């Protein structure tokens, strides 16, 4: 589908507050729905950012300027690539939750332009000024939060406000990260806060969509061995996970972090088992959602091991960033892109290869600690 196509609108609305919703009357089809520019932009930026980071590690280029190369890499994975995919998901999911038409057209163009500006400015912080680059980038998540909050409130879907709490935490973490980078430091607390916020979103939203999609798939084939419906156990698992992540964010080396992380690992492993993911093996688009969620209990175990000085803290971050965040985002991107463009929900060979490669990356990085001689190759 070409980006130069135009899309007519039926019943485009402009509610109080001035945010037009619905498909644009004319203009590029890429700005007709939030997932189109942000999924594409996020995917392309993930590739570009990793190529630049590898080139910097190899000594071919200088990266980040006064912002710092390690800061740039951490930031662009957490707040560059990941925030784009999160934006694409929320701008697609929130209309489904609220029953309102999606934000599109010029507001979507401006929001995407703001995200792009953040990427460009942080590539040349010495040229535009580190403070200017950080300020421009720091505006994106609050802008996304404002749009999503307005839609949820206008739709009176109060139960969905909890999702916006994670987005608020990300906005704060981004600002704290920038402040630390400007001072020449890498804010580990801000990094853990951001990772925790994304993980909480996966716990909440994943707990909503994974069993639902699984149930629908089983029902289509006349199966009755459905996932266990949401009940008090799920609430306990969510609260336990939040407590463990909060402890890890503030006191990552404490014994309390070990205890809460191991308890959360058990609760979320049991939660995953209750969803009966093994029954979905023939459907790769669905089974990868279960695989992504499986990295949550794995991540909690990694937190405990790191607190006991058995595993490096950077490996913990990679279990969450690549395993939980990366795999879940890839799973959601492929499913939403297929579903919202009217195509069959089936993974191509290339898509399956991407699933396998990302899962392998999430496993190999912590495994490399036990084979230090092969660290760079792995």
Task: Mark where each language-model region is.
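Hydrophobic alpha-helical transmembrane segments of multi-pass integral membrane proteins
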Residues: 1-378
